[in-house]
Amino acid sequence: MRGLGLTLAAACAAWLAWWAWPDGAHSEAAAARQAARGGFAPSLIGTRPDGAAAEADGKLVVDQQLRQLFDYYLATLGERDLAVIRTELQGQLKRSLKNGPLAQAMGLFDRYVGYKRSLAGKAAAAATDLSHRLELVQAARRQYFSQAELDGLFGDEDRYDNFTARRLAIEANPALSVDEKRRRVAQLEQQLPPGLRAAREEPVKHLALADAEARLRQGGGGEQQLYQLRAGMVGQAAADRLGELDREQAAWQNRVDDFKRERTAILADGGLSAQQRQQALARLQAQRFSQQESLRLPAYLSN
């Protein structure tokens, strides 16, 4: 699960993101020519496909992993024409699917594209209330997908969106007291599937941990107390990982501080010309940091 990124707001925002979807598609020959001119899409350089495709008992597995794969490629619309995107996706799917499931996947992709296009025509509904937006989105989905496909592609999102709409209705109800609103929202949360409930609680848990850590440090707490605090709030394994991250960050900061001192000495050397200073700084940075680390460096040097 990708957490609470699957939200009602995200579904509604899709209307505006897809309003400029091109009409029709280029021929396969045009798709091949465009792909040949510069690979697939610049924005995907250095990335791996998000999501995955799978089959079971000779049939396509329709789930959110497959939808994520569709969205990964469709995110390049604008950089690449739809025909190019479809051809590239088909090539990716051939690596994991046989002919039957592959045909199912491409048919599902075409309907997914149709669904996305249909949302563009409902952009005006963005001005209405969230519950109405949700109804429009779900009605559009029913026009393109079977119930089994809906459950696979959008199940968790629909459940969380319905929860969100009901929660907002409770919070907006002036007839309810603060305590009654809190009680009803808590009841709604208990109706969420365990995975969604845990995902909803996760950001709150980390915010609470960060606040507790800050109070502990302000009070003079040491590393052992910090570890005990973390283990009690997020578990021993997570506390171990956080401790390792702390050590890595401290080691990195020490390297940055050493670099700053040496850089200051170079800049203060009156015997060097401006060009010599720049060359010396470039050599120093190359000696101390890899190319990847150098990308992080400016943010720390500005402090």
Curated annotation (Swiss-Prot):
A biological-process GO annotation: lipid catabolic process
UniProt cross-references to Pfam families, sorted A to Z: Lipase_chap
Main location: membrane
Keywords: Cell inner membrane, Cell membrane, Chaperone, Lipid degradation, Lipid metabolism, Membrane, Transmembrane, Transmembrane helix
CC annotations in GO: plasma membrane
Keyword Cell membrane belongs to the record: yes
Transmembrane stretches, start-end: 7-23
Topology versus the membrane: Single-pass membrane protein
Gene Ontology MF annotations: unfolded protein binding
Protein localization: Cell inner membrane
Family named by the database record: Belongs to the lipase chaperone family.
Functional description taken from the UniProt entry: May be involved in the folding of the extracellular lipase during its passage through the periplasm.
The name this protein goes by in its record: Lipase chaperone
Source organism per UniProt: Chromobacterium violaceum (strain ATCC 12472 / DSM 30191 / JCM 1249 / CCUG 213 / NBRC 12614 / NCIMB 9131 / NCTC 9757 / MK)
